């Protein structure tokens, strides 16, 4: 079985509070983009999970999200057959694009079908939560408001199709470290989530671009000023709006046309290796 595992971007990301368990309560609008890993899954006779990948930058053992997803399903539902999973990696790793979470979501969907478990979307989302906060959204895809630690997913009207340029600087960002460094009392600019939802419902690309905002950006930029350099180049080449996604370091810009996006990509190529021009999309859904 071959599945597409789509990346996500955060159009808006607000952090509300820190919980007693150490996690943070957030409100974010997530959006699927037409950038995906390809996941090949096949049954094998021996009771084992084998993960291989085209990338040297991700683990293939029980630290891999796809492996964890397979292990959880097998254990919970007493599946004795094994699986071989191959991940053809196209989504930049550790970028804020949910690369690991979306692979896990694809494996949950695929194994639900292969092993005829007949689990509902809701049941898969509950299992997905145990793997990572972005997994439930990745199961649903499209455009959604996510709350809690990101695991509560409220579907929104689909955003209009937009030209999205993604650039990932070659720096490593720890999500945990970014959240720990965030001082909630010093956040000066928060996203207007309601204005973003209205812009999405109206299909107003310029208003969507105007309302892009991520409160984590100030923390990551403080450590890696290259993020601001990427944003400046996008803006100087007519991006309608630009923002960091997730905890970074990937940045995306919304462009009114592909010509401007390609111009920005040419400028960025001087110091950024991973640059992707794509569009928003619905993803694979359930």
From Swiss-Prot:
Catalytic activity: 4-CDP-2-C-methyl-D-erythritol + ATP = 4-CDP-2-C-methyl-D-erythritol 2-phosphate + ADP + H(+)
Pathway it works in: Isoprenoid biosynthesis; isopentenyl diphosphate biosynthesis via DXP pathway; isopentenyl diphosphate from 1-deoxy-D-xylulose 5-phosphate: step 3/6
Any GO BP: terpenoid biosynthetic process
GO molecular function, one term: 4-(cytidine 5'-diphospho)-2-C-methyl-D-erythritol kinase activity
Pfam family, one: GHMP_kinases_N
Active site (record annotation): 8, 134
Residues binding ATP, per UniProt: 92-102
EC number: 2.7.1.148
Superkingdom, taxonomy of origin: Bacteria
UniProt keywords, alphabetically: ATP-binding, Isoprene biosynthesis, Kinase, Nucleotide-binding, Transferase
Similarity annotation: Belongs to the GHMP kinase family. IspE subfamily.
Described purpose of this protein according to its UniProt entry: Catalyzes the phosphorylation of the position 2 hydroxy group of 4-diphosphocytidyl-2C-methyl-D-erythritol.
Protein name as catalogued: 4-diphosphocytidyl-2-C-methyl-D-erythritol kinase
